[in-house]
């Protein structure tokens, strides 16, 4: 990845909720493929944010997707598993070893407590469900020689991530806009760029080797990602809804319209 960055080539990480999407992204030569619980919901017509609700165990869903859907069809691209590091129902160190054993090349902290704010966040933290603990789980994954990635929602979180030596940081600008199940509005792209850069600089001030990417909000098309990368220090883009959901929605509607236009 560092060689690509040195050649001024943007990195691309694609979240894939089905084997078909993963196979196509693999053939397209993307840098990393992400396998998260949200992909299963997203590609079954449910808003991605459902992955943050108590309707399924995020780690079980990801592991099942990885074993049955994603890893069997990906031939060339490293696959990263989205883990919920605060899962109280399992030994996360053993789980990480299982992730390594099935062929995952790395892990990303997702779903994450970082997405939650307000009073409920304070209550979670008071009983030990903290972002710092999530980061410590990712740090353990590094000891297993796994690539580590973390979404980030604030400058303070960025410092935790950088201090733990996590490999890639991804400032998260919120749920992706556009399509049938995306948010209708988020911060303007210039505001997203400012917030992204503030998070990146906080991380780089502690760990200059961390690789920053961008994701979410109004960064939903290549031109948006290009704007962010030209106005921040981000070296690439993480896409999920913008890679698999929105393009699929457009393509299926267009081809169906073509068939429906046939007259006898």
Question: Where are each of the predicted segments found?
Answer:
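Catalytic cores of alpha/beta
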Residues: 18-28, 89-98, 154-165, 217-234
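N-terminal amphipathic alpha-helix/helix-capping segment at the start of soluble metabolic enzymes
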Residues: 1-15, 23-27, 67-76, 264
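Alpha-helix-loop-beta-strand connector modules within alpha/beta enzyme cores
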Residues: 46-81, 123-153, 184-212, 231-232, ...
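Hydrophobic faces of well-ordered beta-strands that scaffold small-molecule active sites
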Residues: 12-16, 33-35, 79-83, 107-109, ...
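Active-site beta->alpha loop and helix N-cap motifs at the rims of alpha/beta catalytic domains
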Residues: 21, 28, 32, 49-131
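Glycine-rich phosphate-binding active-site loops on the catalytic face of alpha/beta enzymes
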Residues: 32-44, 101-117, 168-183, 231-255
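Histidine/lysine/aspartate-rich catalytic loop segments that bind and position anionic ligands
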Residues: 112-136, 156-186
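Active-site beta-loop-alpha junctions enriched in small/polar residues
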Residues: 17-19, 38, 82-86, 112-114, ...
